[in-house]
Amino acid sequence: MDYLQIKKSPKLHGEIKISGAKNAALPLIAMSILAKNIVTIKNLPHVADIKTLLKLLSNLGAECSSSWENYSTTINTSTLNQTKATYDIVKTMRASILVLGPILARFGHCEVSLPGGCAIGQRPIDLHLKALEQMGAVINIEAGYIHAIAPDGLKGCNIIFDKITVTGTANIVMAAALAKGVTTITNAAREPEVVQLCEILNASGVKIEGIETAVLTIHGTGGELLEIAPFSVIPDRIEAGTYLCAGAITKSELTLKGANAKHLGAVLSKLEEMGSKFTITDDSITIHPSKIIKHVKIVTQEYPAFPTDMQAQFLALATQADGTSIIEERLFENRFMHVSELQRMGADISLNGNVATVNGHSKLSGTDVMATDLRASSALVLAGLVADGITDVHRIYHLDRGYDSLEKKLQNVGADISRLKE
Protein backbone atom coordinates (compact mmCIF):
# COMPACT_ATOMS: atom_id res chain seq x y z
CA MET A 1 0.00 0.00 0.00
CA ASP A 2 1.25 3.48 -0.87
CA TYR A 3 1.67 6.47 1.42
CA LEU A 4 2.76 10.06 0.90
CA GLN A 5 5.82 11.48 2.63
CA ILE A 6 5.88 15.27 2.90
CA LYS A 7 8.62 17.52 4.18
CA LYS A 8 8.20 21.18 5.00
CA SER A 9 8.33 22.90 1.66
CA PRO A 10 9.83 26.24 0.72
CA LYS A 11 7.64 28.61 -1.23
CA LEU A 12 5.96 26.91 -4.17
CA HIS A 13 5.97 28.51 -7.60
CA GLY A 14 4.73 27.71 -11.09
CA GLU A 15 1.64 26.35 -12.81
CA ILE A 16 -0.69 23.46 -12.04
CA LYS A 17 -2.97 21.98 -14.70
CA ILE A 18 -6.44 21.33 -13.34
CA SER A 19 -7.98 18.00 -14.32
CA GLY A 20 -11.54 17.25 -15.31
CA ALA A 21 -14.05 17.11 -12.47
CA LYS A 22 -14.57 13.64 -11.05
CA ASN A 23 -18.00 14.62 -9.75
CA ALA A 24 -19.01 15.75 -13.24
CA ALA A 25 -17.46 12.78 -15.04
CA LEU A 26 -19.25 10.13 -12.97
CA PRO A 27 -22.84 11.04 -13.97
CA LEU A 28 -21.67 11.70 -17.53
CA ILE A 29 -20.28 8.17 -17.74
CA ALA A 30 -23.57 6.81 -16.37
CA MET A 31 -25.40 8.95 -18.94
CA SER A 32 -23.81 6.89 -21.73
CA ILE A 33 -26.32 4.15 -20.84
CA LEU A 34 -28.96 6.38 -22.46
CA ALA A 35 -27.07 6.62 -25.78
CA LYS A 36 -27.62 4.77 -29.05
CA ASN A 37 -24.17 5.76 -30.35
CA ILE A 38 -20.63 5.37 -29.08
CA VAL A 39 -20.00 8.17 -26.57
CA THR A 40 -16.63 9.95 -26.48
CA ILE A 41 -15.66 11.71 -23.24
CA LYS A 42 -12.62 14.00 -23.11
CA ASN A 43 -10.74 15.65 -20.23
CA LEU A 44 -11.47 12.61 -18.09
CA PRO A 45 -9.57 12.63 -14.77
CA HIS A 46 -7.24 9.70 -14.16
CA VAL A 47 -8.64 8.73 -10.73
CA ALA A 48 -9.80 5.51 -9.10
CA ASP A 49 -13.51 6.35 -8.98
CA ILE A 50 -13.62 6.85 -12.76
CA LYS A 51 -11.93 3.50 -13.34
CA THR A 52 -14.41 1.87 -10.95
CA LEU A 53 -17.46 3.16 -12.81
CA LEU A 54 -15.99 2.21 -16.20
CA LYS A 55 -15.34 -1.27 -14.83
CA LEU A 56 -18.95 -1.44 -13.65
CA LEU A 57 -20.20 -0.53 -17.14
CA SER A 58 -17.88 -3.14 -18.64
CA ASN A 59 -19.33 -5.75 -16.29
CA LEU A 60 -22.79 -4.77 -17.55
CA GLY A 61 -21.62 -5.51 -21.10
CA ALA A 62 -20.55 -2.07 -22.34
CA GLU A 63 -17.41 -1.73 -24.42
CA CYS A 64 -15.16 0.87 -22.79
CA SER A 65 -11.88 1.91 -24.38
CA SER A 66 -9.83 4.43 -22.42
CA SER A 67 -6.72 6.36 -23.45
CA TRP A 68 -5.37 7.66 -20.16
CA GLU A 69 -2.50 9.40 -21.95
CA ASN A 70 -5.12 11.51 -23.75
CA TYR A 71 -7.52 11.66 -20.79
CA SER A 72 -10.36 10.28 -22.89
CA THR A 73 -12.62 7.26 -23.18
CA THR A 74 -15.17 5.86 -25.59
CA ILE A 75 -18.19 3.94 -24.31
CA ASN A 76 -20.41 1.71 -26.43
CA THR A 77 -23.53 0.76 -24.46
CA SER A 78 -25.31 -0.91 -27.38
CA THR A 79 -23.67 -4.13 -26.15
CA LEU A 80 -25.17 -3.94 -22.64
CA ASN A 81 -26.45 -7.38 -21.66
CA GLN A 82 -26.72 -7.15 -17.86
CA THR A 83 -28.89 -5.02 -15.59
CA LYS A 84 -27.38 -6.07 -12.26
CA ALA A 85 -24.70 -3.89 -10.64
CA THR A 86 -23.04 -6.25 -8.21
CA TYR A 87 -21.76 -5.62 -4.71
CA ASP A 88 -18.08 -6.27 -5.43
CA ILE A 89 -17.83 -3.01 -7.41
CA VAL A 90 -20.62 -0.89 -5.95
CA LYS A 91 -19.30 -1.39 -2.39
CA THR A 92 -16.20 0.67 -3.21
CA MET A 93 -18.00 3.79 -4.42
CA ARG A 94 -21.31 5.41 -3.53
CA ALA A 95 -21.59 7.05 -6.95
CA SER A 96 -22.26 3.62 -8.47
CA ILE A 97 -25.90 4.33 -7.59
CA LEU A 98 -25.87 6.67 -10.61
CA VAL A 99 -26.49 3.70 -12.92
CA LEU A 100 -29.86 3.02 -11.27
CA GLY A 101 -31.86 5.71 -13.07
CA PRO A 102 -30.39 5.16 -16.56
CA ILE A 103 -30.62 1.34 -16.48
CA LEU A 104 -34.19 1.43 -15.22
CA ALA A 105 -35.15 4.02 -17.84
CA ARG A 106 -33.58 2.03 -20.68
CA PHE A 107 -34.48 -1.55 -19.77
CA GLY A 108 -37.43 -1.23 -17.38
CA HIS A 109 -35.73 -3.29 -14.68
CA CYS A 110 -32.46 -3.39 -12.74
CA GLU A 111 -30.73 -4.59 -9.61
CA VAL A 112 -28.17 -2.36 -7.93
CA SER A 113 -26.28 -3.20 -4.76
CA LEU A 114 -26.61 -0.73 -1.93
CA PRO A 115 -23.55 1.54 -2.20
CA GLY A 116 -20.35 2.09 -0.23
CA GLY A 117 -17.70 4.85 -0.48
CA CYS A 118 -16.39 7.52 1.89
CA ALA A 119 -17.20 7.05 5.57
CA ILE A 120 -18.49 10.58 6.16
CA GLY A 121 -21.90 9.93 7.57
CA GLN A 122 -25.24 8.74 6.34
CA ARG A 123 -25.94 9.73 2.77
CA PRO A 124 -29.21 7.86 2.21
CA ILE A 125 -30.54 7.10 -1.24
CA ASP A 126 -34.17 7.14 -0.16
CA LEU A 127 -34.72 10.36 -2.11
CA HIS A 128 -33.67 8.60 -5.33
CA LEU A 129 -35.96 5.66 -4.66
CA LYS A 130 -38.97 7.75 -3.66
CA ALA A 131 -38.68 9.79 -6.85
CA LEU A 132 -38.40 6.69 -9.05
CA GLU A 133 -41.48 5.25 -7.37
CA GLN A 134 -43.35 8.45 -8.19
CA MET A 135 -42.33 7.85 -11.81
CA GLY A 136 -43.94 4.41 -11.76
CA ALA A 137 -41.17 2.12 -10.55
CA VAL A 138 -41.81 -0.70 -8.12
CA ILE A 139 -38.86 -0.96 -5.76
CA ASN A 140 -37.90 -3.53 -3.15
CA ILE A 141 -34.72 -3.88 -1.14
CA GLU A 142 -33.71 -7.48 -0.54
CA ALA A 143 -30.42 -9.01 0.57
CA GLY A 144 -28.53 -5.75 0.11
CA TYR A 145 -29.83 -5.07 -3.39
CA ILE A 146 -32.26 -2.53 -4.80
CA HIS A 147 -34.68 -4.40 -7.09
CA ALA A 148 -36.48 -1.97 -9.38
CA ILE A 149 -38.94 -2.62 -12.18
CA ALA A 150 -41.04 -0.27 -14.28
CA PRO A 151 -43.48 -2.61 -16.04
CA ASP A 152 -45.08 0.19 -18.04
CA GLY A 153 -41.96 2.32 -18.33
CA LEU A 154 -41.17 5.44 -16.34
CA LYS A 155 -43.64 8.29 -16.56
CA GLY A 156 -43.05 11.99 -16.03
CA CYS A 157 -44.39 13.53 -12.84
CA ASN A 158 -43.80 16.32 -10.34
CA ILE A 159 -41.01 15.53 -7.90
CA ILE A 160 -40.14 17.64 -4.87
CA PHE A 161 -36.93 16.69 -3.11
CA ASP A 162 -37.21 17.07 0.67
CA LYS A 163 -33.57 18.14 0.69
CA ILE A 164 -31.11 19.03 -2.03
CA THR A 165 -29.30 15.98 -3.37
CA VAL A 166 -26.67 16.24 -6.09
CA THR A 167 -26.52 12.55 -6.94
CA GLY A 168 -30.28 12.24 -6.59
CA THR A 169 -30.87 15.12 -8.99
CA ALA A 170 -28.50 13.58 -11.54
CA ASN A 171 -30.10 10.15 -11.20
CA ILE A 172 -33.64 11.42 -11.69
CA VAL A 173 -32.68 13.75 -14.55
CA MET A 174 -31.23 10.74 -16.40
CA ALA A 175 -34.27 8.59 -15.62
CA ALA A 176 -36.58 11.39 -16.78
CA ALA A 177 -34.64 11.78 -20.03
CA LEU A 178 -36.13 8.55 -21.43
CA ALA A 179 -39.43 8.69 -19.53
CA LYS A 180 -42.82 9.30 -21.12
CA GLY A 181 -44.02 12.86 -20.63
CA VAL A 182 -42.70 15.73 -18.58
CA THR A 183 -40.90 15.52 -15.23
CA THR A 184 -40.49 18.53 -12.97
CA ILE A 185 -37.88 18.41 -10.20
CA THR A 186 -38.28 21.02 -7.48
CA ASN A 187 -35.42 21.71 -5.04
CA ALA A 188 -32.97 20.37 -7.62
CA ALA A 189 -29.23 20.69 -7.08
CA ARG A 190 -27.59 23.55 -9.00
CA GLU A 191 -23.97 22.39 -8.86
CA PRO A 192 -21.91 22.93 -12.04
CA GLU A 193 -21.63 19.15 -12.36
CA VAL A 194 -25.43 18.83 -12.55
CA VAL A 195 -25.59 21.77 -14.95
CA GLN A 196 -23.17 20.09 -17.37
CA LEU A 197 -25.19 16.87 -17.31
CA CYS A 198 -28.36 18.82 -18.13
CA GLU A 199 -26.66 20.82 -20.87
CA ILE A 200 -25.37 17.69 -22.62
CA LEU A 201 -28.74 15.93 -22.37
CA ASN A 202 -30.38 19.10 -23.68
CA ALA A 203 -28.02 19.07 -26.68
CA SER A 204 -28.77 15.37 -27.23
CA GLY A 205 -32.51 15.70 -27.83
CA VAL A 206 -33.91 15.94 -24.30
CA LYS A 207 -35.49 19.34 -23.79
CA ILE A 208 -34.61 20.56 -20.29
CA GLU A 209 -35.83 23.88 -18.95
CA GLY A 210 -34.59 25.69 -15.85
CA ILE A 211 -30.95 24.63 -16.11
CA GLU A 212 -28.91 26.34 -13.33
CA THR A 213 -32.09 26.87 -11.28
CA ALA A 214 -33.71 24.87 -8.47
CA VAL A 215 -36.61 23.80 -10.71
CA LEU A 216 -35.84 21.54 -13.66
CA THR A 217 -38.39 20.53 -16.28
CA ILE A 218 -37.38 17.50 -18.36
CA HIS A 219 -39.29 16.50 -21.50
CA GLY A 220 -38.66 12.77 -21.85
CA THR A 221 -38.15 11.01 -25.18
CA GLY A 222 -40.59 8.19 -24.38
CA GLY A 223 -37.88 5.56 -24.57
CA GLU A 224 -36.02 6.78 -27.63
CA LEU A 225 -32.27 6.51 -27.07
CA LEU A 226 -30.07 9.58 -27.46
CA GLU A 227 -27.42 10.65 -29.95
CA ILE A 228 -24.69 12.12 -27.74
CA ALA A 229 -21.90 14.12 -29.39
CA PRO A 230 -18.32 14.08 -28.03
CA PHE A 231 -17.79 16.40 -25.07
CA SER A 232 -15.18 17.46 -22.50
CA VAL A 233 -15.63 17.26 -18.74
CA ILE A 234 -15.62 20.61 -16.92
CA PRO A 235 -12.58 21.42 -14.73
CA ASP A 236 -12.55 20.15 -11.16
CA ARG A 237 -13.47 23.06 -8.89
CA ILE A 238 -12.56 21.10 -5.74
CA GLU A 239 -9.12 20.20 -7.06
CA ALA A 240 -8.64 23.86 -8.00
CA GLY A 241 -9.77 24.97 -4.54
CA THR A 242 -7.35 22.54 -2.92
CA TYR A 243 -4.36 23.94 -4.84
CA LEU A 244 -5.47 27.49 -4.07
CA CYS A 245 -5.32 26.50 -0.39
CA ALA A 246 -1.83 25.08 -1.02
CA GLY A 247 -0.79 28.48 -2.32
CA ALA A 248 -2.41 30.28 0.60
CA ILE A 249 -1.00 28.04 3.36
CA THR A 250 2.56 28.14 1.96
CA LYS A 251 2.19 31.84 1.03
CA SER A 252 3.13 30.99 -2.55
CA GLU A 253 2.00 32.44 -5.86
CA LEU A 254 0.55 29.66 -8.01
CA THR A 255 -1.28 29.70 -11.34
CA LEU A 256 -3.98 27.13 -12.02
CA LYS A 257 -4.40 26.45 -15.73
CA GLY A 258 -7.74 25.20 -17.00
CA ALA A 259 -9.61 26.36 -13.89
CA ASN A 260 -13.04 27.99 -14.09
CA ALA A 261 -13.34 30.81 -11.55
CA LYS A 262 -17.09 31.06 -12.17
CA HIS A 263 -17.52 27.73 -10.36
CA LEU A 264 -15.43 28.85 -7.37
CA GLY A 265 -17.24 31.96 -6.19
CA ALA A 266 -17.64 31.01 -2.52
CA VAL A 267 -14.12 29.55 -2.27
CA LEU A 268 -12.48 32.62 -3.81
CA SER A 269 -14.58 34.88 -1.59
CA LYS A 270 -13.40 33.14 1.59
CA LEU A 271 -9.77 33.15 0.45
CA GLU A 272 -10.10 36.88 -0.20
CA GLU A 273 -11.45 37.30 3.34
CA MET A 274 -8.32 35.49 4.53
CA GLY A 275 -6.12 37.97 2.66
CA SER A 276 -5.42 36.44 -0.75
CA LYS A 277 -5.84 38.28 -4.05
CA PHE A 278 -6.34 36.79 -7.50
CA THR A 279 -5.66 37.37 -11.17
CA ILE A 280 -8.40 35.64 -13.15
CA THR A 281 -8.71 34.88 -16.87
CA ASP A 282 -11.19 32.74 -18.79
CA ASP A 283 -9.18 29.59 -18.08
CA SER A 284 -6.77 30.39 -15.26
CA ILE A 285 -6.57 31.61 -11.69
CA THR A 286 -3.40 33.00 -10.11
CA ILE A 287 -3.36 33.33 -6.33
CA HIS A 288 -1.39 36.17 -4.74
CA PRO A 289 -1.40 35.11 -1.08
CA SER A 290 -1.17 37.38 1.90
CA LYS A 291 1.81 37.31 4.24
CA ILE A 292 -0.69 37.21 7.10
CA ILE A 293 -3.56 34.71 6.86
CA LYS A 294 -6.69 36.17 8.44
CA HIS A 295 -9.19 34.16 10.44
CA VAL A 296 -12.52 33.30 8.85
CA LYS A 297 -16.03 32.02 9.52
CA ILE A 298 -17.32 29.32 7.17
CA VAL A 299 -20.65 27.53 6.91
CA THR A 300 -20.93 24.68 4.41
CA GLN A 301 -24.10 24.64 2.34
CA GLU A 302 -25.29 23.60 -1.09
CA TYR A 303 -23.99 25.34 -4.21
CA PRO A 304 -23.54 28.22 -4.82
CA ALA A 305 -22.65 28.54 -1.11
CA PHE A 306 -19.42 27.20 0.39
CA PRO A 307 -18.85 23.53 -0.61
CA THR A 308 -18.56 20.82 2.01
CA ASP A 309 -15.81 19.28 -0.14
CA MET A 310 -13.57 22.26 0.71
CA GLN A 311 -14.22 22.27 4.45
CA ALA A 312 -11.25 20.09 5.43
CA GLN A 313 -8.76 22.06 3.33
CA PHE A 314 -9.88 25.39 4.81
CA LEU A 315 -9.71 23.90 8.29
CA ALA A 316 -6.05 23.04 7.65
CA LEU A 317 -5.48 26.57 6.32
CA ALA A 318 -7.15 28.07 9.40
CA THR A 319 -4.55 26.43 11.67
CA GLN A 320 -2.07 28.95 10.26
CA ALA A 321 -4.36 31.99 10.45
CA ASP A 322 -4.09 35.01 12.69
CA GLY A 323 -6.90 34.55 15.21
CA THR A 324 -9.72 32.08 15.72
CA SER A 325 -11.74 30.64 12.84
CA ILE A 326 -15.17 29.02 13.09
CA ILE A 327 -16.12 26.29 10.61
CA GLU A 328 -19.65 24.88 10.67
CA GLU A 329 -20.53 21.72 8.71
CA ARG A 330 -24.22 21.69 7.81
CA LEU A 331 -24.38 19.00 5.12
CA PHE A 332 -22.83 15.85 6.59
CA GLU A 333 -22.37 14.43 10.05
CA ASN A 334 -19.03 12.81 10.89
CA ARG A 335 -17.16 15.06 8.49
CA PHE A 336 -14.61 16.25 11.02
CA MET A 337 -12.67 12.99 11.24
CA HIS A 338 -9.55 14.78 9.98
CA VAL A 339 -9.55 16.96 13.11
CA SER A 340 -8.01 14.31 15.36
CA GLU A 341 -5.20 13.75 12.85
CA LEU A 342 -4.50 17.49 12.59
CA GLN A 343 -4.51 17.67 16.39
CA ARG A 344 -1.81 14.99 16.44
CA MET A 345 0.27 17.36 14.30
CA GLY A 346 -0.23 20.13 16.87
CA ALA A 347 -3.33 21.91 15.59
CA ASP A 348 -5.40 23.72 18.23
CA ILE A 349 -8.93 22.68 17.27
CA SER A 350 -11.99 22.04 19.42
CA LEU A 351 -15.21 20.42 18.26
CA ASN A 352 -18.73 21.07 19.47
CA GLY A 353 -21.16 19.03 17.43
CA ASN A 354 -20.93 20.20 13.84
CA VAL A 355 -18.82 23.28 14.64
CA ALA A 356 -15.03 23.39 14.69
CA THR A 357 -13.21 26.21 16.47
CA VAL A 358 -9.69 26.60 15.07
CA ASN A 359 -7.14 28.69 16.92
CA GLY A 360 -4.51 29.92 14.51
CA HIS A 361 -0.73 30.18 14.64
CA SER A 362 -0.46 26.44 15.32
CA LYS A 363 3.11 25.20 15.07
CA LEU A 364 2.57 21.92 13.26
CA SER A 365 4.98 19.00 13.53
CA GLY A 366 5.25 16.15 11.08
CA THR A 367 4.11 12.71 12.20
CA ASP A 368 2.26 9.65 10.91
CA VAL A 369 -1.36 10.45 10.08
CA MET A 370 -4.18 8.47 8.50
CA ALA A 371 -6.53 9.71 5.82
CA THR A 372 -10.16 9.02 6.71
CA ASP A 373 -11.83 10.16 3.51
CA LEU A 374 -11.06 11.83 0.20
CA ARG A 375 -10.97 15.49 1.19
CA ALA A 376 -9.49 14.81 4.64
CA SER A 377 -6.54 13.31 2.78
CA SER A 378 -5.81 16.57 1.00
CA ALA A 379 -6.12 18.54 4.26
CA LEU A 380 -3.37 16.41 5.79
CA VAL A 381 -1.18 17.01 2.74
CA LEU A 382 -1.69 20.77 3.10
CA ALA A 383 -0.75 20.60 6.77
CA GLY A 384 2.33 18.57 5.88
CA LEU A 385 3.54 21.31 3.53
CA VAL A 386 4.01 23.69 6.49
CA ALA A 387 4.75 21.24 9.32
CA ASP A 388 8.24 20.91 10.76
CA GLY A 389 9.83 17.55 10.09
CA ILE A 390 8.34 14.70 8.09
CA THR A 391 4.64 13.96 7.64
CA ASP A 392 3.62 10.51 6.42
CA VAL A 393 0.02 10.33 5.18
CA HIS A 394 -1.27 6.76 5.14
CA ARG A 395 -4.36 5.19 3.51
CA ILE A 396 -4.05 7.46 0.50
CA TYR A 397 -6.31 5.18 -1.52
CA HIS A 398 -8.90 7.73 -0.38
CA LEU A 399 -6.87 10.46 -2.08
CA ASP A 400 -6.48 8.44 -5.27
CA ARG A 401 -10.25 8.18 -5.58
CA GLY A 402 -10.54 11.85 -6.46
CA TYR A 403 -7.18 13.55 -7.13
CA ASP A 404 -5.32 13.01 -10.39
CA SER A 405 -1.54 12.84 -9.76
CA LEU A 406 -1.63 15.11 -6.71
CA GLU A 407 1.93 14.45 -5.58
CA LYS A 408 3.30 14.94 -9.12
CA LYS A 409 1.47 18.24 -9.53
CA LEU A 410 2.82 19.46 -6.19
CA GLN A 411 6.34 18.23 -7.01
CA ASN A 412 6.21 20.25 -10.23
CA VAL A 413 5.72 23.48 -8.26
CA GLY A 414 8.45 22.74 -5.74
CA ALA A 415 6.83 20.73 -2.95
CA ASP A 416 8.93 18.10 -1.19
CA ILE A 417 6.47 15.22 -1.47
CA SER A 418 6.98 11.59 -2.48
CA ARG A 419 4.82 8.50 -2.97
CA LEU A 420 6.36 5.54 -1.16
CA LYS A 421 5.48 1.92 -0.40
CA GLU A 422 4.53 0.87 3.13
Curated annotation (Swiss-Prot):
Keywords: Cell cycle, Cell division, Cell shape, Cell wall biogenesis/degradation, Cytoplasm, Peptidoglycan synthesis, Pyruvate, Transferase. The modification 2-(S-cysteinyl)pyruvic acid O-phosphothioketal is found at residue 118. This is UDP-N-acetylglucosamine 1-carboxyvinyltransferase. The gene is murA. GO terms for cellular component: cytoplasm. It is found in: Cytoplasm. Cell wall formation. Adds enolpyruvyl to UDP-N-acetylglucosamine. GO terms for molecular function: UDP-N-acetylglucosamine 1-carboxyvinyltransferase activity. It is an enzyme of class 2 (transferase). The lineage of its organism: Bacteria, Pseudomonadati, Campylobacterota, Epsilonproteobacteria, Campylobacterales. It catalyses: phosphoenolpyruvate + UDP-N-acetyl-alpha-D-glucosamine = UDP-N-acetyl-3-O-(1-carboxyvinyl)-alpha-D-glucosamine + phosphate. Phosphoenolpyruvate binds at residues 22-23. InterPro entries: Enolpyruvate_Tfrase_dom, Enolpyruvate_Tfrase_sf, MurA_subfamily, RNA3'P_cycl/enolpyr_Trfase_a/b, UDP_GlcNAc_COvinyl_MurA. Its EC number is 2.5.1.7. The active site is at 118 (proton donor). The keyword Ion transport does not apply. Belongs to the EPSP synthase family. MurA subfamily. Pathway: Cell wall biogenesis; peptidoglycan biosynthesis. PANTHER family: UDP-N-ACETYLGLUCOSAMINE 1-CARBOXYVINYLTRANSFERASE. GO terms for biological process: cell division; cell wall organization; peptidoglycan biosynthetic process; regulation of cell shape; UDP-N-acetylgalactosamine biosynthetic process. UDP-N-acetyl-alpha-D-glucosamine binds at residues 94, 123-127, 309, 331.
